[in-house]
Swiss-Prot record:
This is Uridylate kinase. Belongs to the UMP kinase family. Pfam families: AA_kinase. InterPro entries: AceGlu_kinase-like_sf, Asp/Glu/Uridylate_kinase, Uridylate_kinase, Uridylate_kinase_bac. Inhibited by UTP. It comes from the Bacteria. CDD domains: AAK_UMPK-PyrH-Ec. One of its GO terms (biological process) is UDP biosynthetic process. Catalyzes the reversible phosphorylation of UMP to UDP. ATP binds at K8, L9, S10, G11, G51, R55, T156, Y162, D165. The keyword ATP-binding applies. One of its GO terms (molecular function) is UMP kinase activity. The gene is pyrH. Pathway: Pyrimidine metabolism; CTP biosynthesis via de novo pathway; UDP from UMP (UMPK route): step 1/1.
Length: 234
């Protein structure tokens, strides 16, 4: 059983693929999955992307720094939305960020993070790394290390990591466990380079799994065989 976990989700978890805004069915599913682990006492941090709010690639003419700042603010919007929905469902939630302080958003202080966890809060990390040119994957890797997580879960639409695209190749092989060095050698795109290097440097386990399969989050927390686990060595 993992006691301290960082969950990284894309904004599409809230909206559906290639959609904008919030899809009620998807949000209710997320709430159900989070509630499903609440009785086990796992301290949970969440990093959510902003693809359902804003994608810089959809807008030509924006400077990358401005595009990235809009994306960071998009993660704050998602965090505020989730906090309200979570709390309406009985999930105590706090938002922390390095870029925005609002009545419902606290400035990151890692002494306080431990207090929030001990009090039973889910902690949503908003605003990415607070710097442009870094993805929310990198933000998730940083927050996972900073909150002393035992596992970083990357919730996706696929069942794990494959040797080739399973949508294109029927003989694609799924890895149950793979090392960092193997993943680099095989050029498997698990996270962006910066995020992956942070996890490798600090021996952070990464679990890539299908978030949309009922009960997978609880299975992951329990350490059951789900998705693909990336480890320092086997």
């Amino acid at each position: 059983m993992y006691k301290r976990v960082l969950l990284k989700l894309s904004g599409e978890v809230l909206s559906g693929e290639d959609q904008k805004g919030f899809n009620e069915e998807h949000v209710e599913y997320l709430i159900k999955e989070i509630k499903g682990i609440s009785e086990y006492g796992t301290k949970l941090g969440i990093v959510i992307g902003a693809g359902n709010i804003f994608r810089g690639r959809d807008f030509e003419g924006l400077r990358p720094t401005i595009s990235d700042q809009i994306g960071m603010l998009g993660t704050v919007i998602n965090a505020l939305y989730l906090k309200d929905r979570f709390e309406n469902a009985g999930i105590r939630t706090v938002i922390v960020s390095q870029i925005v302080t609002l009545p419902s958003v606290k400035l990151i202080n890692y002494d306080d993070i431990d207090l929030y966890f001990d009090a039973g809060y889910v902690v949503i990390f908003a605003g990415g790394t607070s710097n442009p040119f870094f993805t929310t994957d990198t933000g998730a890797a940083l927050r996972a290390v900073e909150m002393k997580a035992e596992l970083l879960i990357k919730g996706t639409k696929v069942c794990g990591i494959y040797d080739k695209d399973p949508k294109k190749y029927s003989d694609a092989k799924k890895y149950n466990v793979i090392t960092y060095d193997e993943a680099i050698e095989k050029n498997l795109k698990i996270m962006d380079t910066e995020a992956f290097s942070i996890c490798k440097r600090y021996n952070m386990k990464i679990l890539v799994m299908n978030f949309f399969e009922n009960g997978n989050l609880l299975k992951a927390i329990k350490g059951e065989n789900v998705g693909t686990l990336v480890v320092p060595k086997v």
